[in-house]
Amino acid sequence: MAGKAHRLSAEERDQLLPNLRAVGWNEVEGRDAIFKQFHFKDFNRAFGFMTRVALQAEKLDHHPEWFNVYNKVHITLSTHECAGLSERDINLASFIEQVAVSMT
């Protein structure tokens, strides 16, 4: 990924986070990160979702923290490089939303 990631400013957060909050992303208490839990019809759909996200994450060299049990996928996004939320997290969360919508 080009350029060093920078932590989002308060102004950038005010501009970028409302759309994600509107679709269920929440800020993690005590950590500069965002989180969302996804539910799918079954394990195959959950795994397909994770596969599509993984391919994009690898392409972007920006990887989620995630946990999967059967049809549930929990995702936390934060940028290690800047120890907090960056535009990379916002972009990946937006992509994740597109994938989730396409699989329901």
UniProtKB/Swiss-Prot annotation:
GO biological process, one term: positive regulation of DNA-templated transcription
Documented EC number(s): 4.2.1.96
Keyword Acyltransferase: no
Gene3D superfamilies noted in UniProt: Transcriptional coactivator/pterin dehydratase (3.30.1360.20)
N-acetylalanine carried by residues: 2
Pfam families in alphabetical order: Pterin_4a
InterPro entries, alphabetized: PCD_sf, Pterin_deHydtase
Any GO CC annotation of this UniProt entry: nucleus
Taxonomic superkingdom: Eukaryota
List of residues binding substrate: 61-63, 78-81
Keywords, alphabetical: Acetylation, Activator, Cytoplasm, Lyase, Nucleus, Tetrahydrobiopterin biosynthesis, Transcription, Transcription regulation
Tissue: Mainly expressed in the liver, in pancreatic cells, and in the kidney, especially in the distal convoluted tubule, in the cortical thick ascending limb of Henle's loop and in the connecting tubule.
Compartment list: Cytoplasm; Nucleus
Coiled coil start-end: none
GO molecular function, one term: phenylalanine 4-monooxygenase activity
Enzymatic reactions: (4aS,6R)-4a-hydroxy-L-erythro-5,6,7,8-tetrahydrobiopterin = (6R)-L-erythro-6,7-dihydrobiopterin + H2O
Induction: Up-regulated by a low magnesium-containing diet.
Similarity section: Belongs to the pterin-4-alpha-carbinolamine dehydratase family.
Function, as annotated: Involved in tetrahydrobiopterin biosynthesis. Seems to both prevent the formation of 7-pterins and accelerate the formation of quinonoid-BH2. Coactivator for HNF1A-dependent transcription. Regulates the dimerization of homeodomain protein HNF1A and enhances its transcriptional activity. Also acts as a coactivator for HNF1B-dependent transcription.
Classification via PANTHER family: PTERIN-4-ALPHA-CARBINOLAMINE DEHYDRATASE
Subunit structure: Homotetramer and homodimer. Heterotetramer with HNF1A; formed by a dimer of dimers. Interacts with HNF1B (via HNF-p1 domain); the interaction increases HNF1B transactivation activity.
Protein name: Pterin-4-alpha-carbinolamine dehydratase
Organism: Mus musculus (Mouse)
Lineage, highest ranks first: Eukaryota, Metazoa, Chordata, Craniata, Vertebrata
